[in-house]
Amino acid sequence: MKYLLKTQLPLLLLIGMVINGQQSQEGHLLLSQLEIENTDQPWWPATKNKAITNAPIKIAGNPYKHGIGTLSGSRLFFFLDGRSSDFKCHVGIQDKQDPAENVQFNVLSDGSKLFYTQQQGEKTFVGIANTKNNIGKGSVRFIIKGDGKTLWKSKKITGGQKPQPVKIDLSGIQVLELSVEDNGDGISGDHAIWAQPTVTYTSFKPQLVDANYLNKLKTVDKNFTNKIKPLVQELPMGQGEYVQGTKADWLVNDINLPSKVYQQANGKEIVISNGLVSRTFRLTPNCATVGFTNLTTAETLLRGVGPEATITLDGDEYVVGGLDGQIEYGYMKEEWLEQMWSPPNSFQLSNFTVGTIKKRINWPNKRWSSQPKGPIKGKHIGFDYTHPKYPDLAVTVHYEIYDGIPLISKWITLKNNGQKAVVLNSFKSEILAMVEAESAVEKQKGWETPNIHVESDYAFHSMSMKNANKVVHWEKDPRYTSQASYLLSTPCLLECKLPIGPNKTLDANGTFQSFRVWEMPFDSHDKQRKALYTNAMYAKIAPWVTENPLFLHLTTTDDDKVKAAIDQCAETGYEMVILSFGSGLNMEDLSKSNIEKFKALADYAHSKGIELGGYSLLSSRWISEEVDVINPETGKRGGVIHGSSPCLNSQWGIDYFEKLRTFFSKTGFDLLEHDGSYPGQLCASTSHIGHKGLEDSQWKSWKRITDFYKWCNENGISLNIPDWYYLSGSTKNGIGYREVNWSLPRERQLVLGRQNMYDGTYDRLPSMSWTFVPLTEYHGGGAAATIEPLDTHLGAYKAHMIQNYGMGLQACYRGPRLYDTEKTKATVIEVVAWYKKYRDILNSPIIHLKRANGREIDGIMHINPALQEKGLALFFNPTNKTLTQTINLPLYYTGHSKKVQISEKDKEKVEYELARDYLVELEVQIPPNDSTWFVIY
């Protein structure tokens, strides 16, 4: 059955009803076309276009093709939405039939019998009486009500009486009720007929609803009128740049426009906007996103309405908010919203709150970074939802919009305020019917997706965002039947959902917070401009990634050598020593001697103004059968990502993180270099203490490791992790290189290193990555590959430092020392001093000018219109001859539009006029295998 009123539809169904057809603008509806047979009435279901006895409809000899066959005691309810004009029908009692053959019966509580026949499993009603031969002729009264008030009531109607015509005005009626009452002489023979029951409607097609629907409407209307609407009215009206968008380019100009939540003139919608992006929510008959606009281009991103989220509880899926009834999913018109209803069985909006953005992670910002201390500015709005089946479960959908950047964040939370446990099997925290990026008729090998950046903090098992982004999916939208694709395969439905689980049990007072997603529409397809968007996003939502301490990768834990390295760092301007892999550091050793050893070294480093960090390996380890991840395919350990790995939710895994917390707390270490971080593997074990089984293993593991990373971040512990954990507190990731390349000859390392940095600084800030310099042998290569002795290979050593620091990256200078002679020391001091002088601009986003190819000048340019140094361009000559070239330097993103001053290597400034395309012609001459740099003021 599609619709069974006897099962009590969830309260707050609202205007939702299960239908198959689409709305019509105007027409006449025979109510018998609806799912009448699935309604609830005493003794036997109503019948469509037949009498209750399944015979053709006939009243006093008058046949009718259409009608509803019922019994006395029946009540039928139809939602009209106040947009029907009249109701017409004929009423009467079905003519008596000859006694049926092979009649069976059930005895009723009053001693009478319900007679029926049965053929091939199908039962047919005959009547109610003491015997099958004395079924009465029937005697009833028909009643028509509108919104609970009687509109018409018949006199006594008996069997054999001619049909009575009825015509009722329905103007303004929300719910129409058709009922039949017994006339006091019993139900026998009360085979009532609503013949040709026709409603004339405009714009909204009547729908079958349940008996409590009117009360539901009143409840919803009351909640909107008494609670939601007053909250809306407290908000300001939208105007100016919040509605039309700001005209300035936010990548060049500081947008001093605080985010705002405002109301629409219709009183039913509210908008979050910062002048760059906006999202519109309609709050009645349920809450739904009905607008998503890129205000920088005035582009509408949304083509359809859907739920705000879906959640599967105890095995059943429920929609959260949303609207149904859109007649076309290729586009959306505002007037259609008035004709839409809340989805059946949905969580209903009960309240909303507006506030400011709260920090996700309380980053202490204790070392150098390009981001100032202070709060992240913007607005937060939370929409609260309830459901009658889960009266103690609070569901909230959260949004944040950030000042000065076209960026919105979203996540959901659940709280169980009752005593009965609830299982959250799965969820979708975002569902958006977006305008497609391309319209292709045939099957595509690769589809272009909408031009919007969507990223989540639920990320792992990759050093790039594209591969680490595990929850963002562009799906087909089967509702979009008018799309160009014959197979309806256009990926234009954004869904954010877990690969599996979380299968989270919410006990009494239990809570759940989903992953977050961030959504940022681009205004261009230009790769460089889109890169500047994401650079700005990371600085805004994960400001800790702008930390960029200068560090030495030390390969020993010998006290004297560590102290000597610390001394060298202090003398040259370096800021941190990292006890690297292979150094002998074991953070899992909490013995008194181990803690005392490394606390003493940390104390010594701090006394010199140097920080101390170290390496720990998590994944790609074989621990034991009881501890390791169980492969779901084999039921045994092994054969998973990294070969074998400990399950983070085994007792060993839980103890591992506690050991690291203890080590850092007792030693005062400042950085964790965490190798083999959690790669998202599933664990099929049912004996690990921290998870129930396969379905919750990934979520629990991700939660455990990201909770640890957040703890580190909040305690001032910097995090170097070769994985995409930035949004969970990590500060650095590898730039993306092939490790064996560091065993190649030095001159090849330099060119390949610049290629790696050039490619790896599009989607992220320079400070977000590390690169590598093998001071000592690494993966082979011998003397031709290493920098040691440093003085002997000082040219290569300096070249590495210039290109790394010049591009804003720290490198893992892996070896026992920073210098071996006074000459080497002076060179290190010179480069570090240069870096620190221009540190702000060198840590700013990069404009990619020319990728290194080993044959000609290559280079990049940092830009930051907020600084005194608006840009710094760095060029390299990889050849054995002097190269001279006129370079068109693009200065648009420096903020200059007319004139600019440029200085080469701190020489006298030269003034240039910008061309109409913001270019200046710069004459560049570079000696063989050397570099030069220019500062733009």
Question: How should each PLM-predicted stretch be described?
Answer:
Residues 913-937:
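C-terminal beta-strand-rich structural cap/linker in extracellular carbohydrate-active enzymes
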Residues 575-582, 657-690:
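Active-site groove signature of glycoside hydrolases
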Residues 219-243, 267-369:
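Acidic-aromatic substrate-binding/catalytic surfaces of carbohydrate-active enzymes
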Residues 23-216:
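Gly-Asp-aromatic-enriched flexible segments
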Residues 598-603, 607, 611-669, 678, ...:
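Active-site-adjacent "subsite" loops/lids of carbohydrate-active enzymes
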Residues 270-275, 279, 286, 292, ...:
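Active-site-proximal substrate-binding groove within the catalytic cores of carbohydrate-active enzymes
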Residues 228, 320, 325-628, 654, ...:
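Conserved structural scaffold segments of CAZyme catalytic domains across common CAZy folds
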Residues 1-24:
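Bacterial Sec-dependent N-terminal signal peptides
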